[in-house]
Amino acid sequence: MPRIHLALLALSLGLCAACGSYTAPTNSQNPPPPMVQANDVSIVVGASGLTTTAFSPNPKVVSLGGSPSVTVRWVNKDITGGDYTSGSATVHNITSDNGTFTASGNLGGNATYSVALTTTGDYHYHCSIHPNMVGTITVNP
């Protein structure tokens, strides 16, 4: 009898170990869409052919609210021909009009870019790839 118990124990441990080693497949080419945050600005579908409506909302109004900075995040939602896993994304590059913040670099589909703004006022920006795309962030106290 003890041999049967040992064999069953070994079999059970082997099955548990095998079940615990599964790794879910991932899709590194198309990350899932990011969760929407309060200070998000979306780059809308078809943005490269638009002007002030390429970013939503535009202008984006945020408040420092007693904090030393407020973070604004752009999300590239300019994906056509499917959803975030099968569609084709247009690349954009968020650039400050006066160099107030560093350019985003190329943002593919669902990519995000965040900037911490520390001073009240208007921050004007555009897409350096599609200069007709323009936007404003207004930071209030």
Predicted regions and their residues:
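Sec-dependent bacterial lipoprotein signal peptides
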Residues: 1-17
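Extracytoplasmic copper-binding redox domains, predominantly the cupredoxin/blue-copper superfamily
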Residues: 19-141
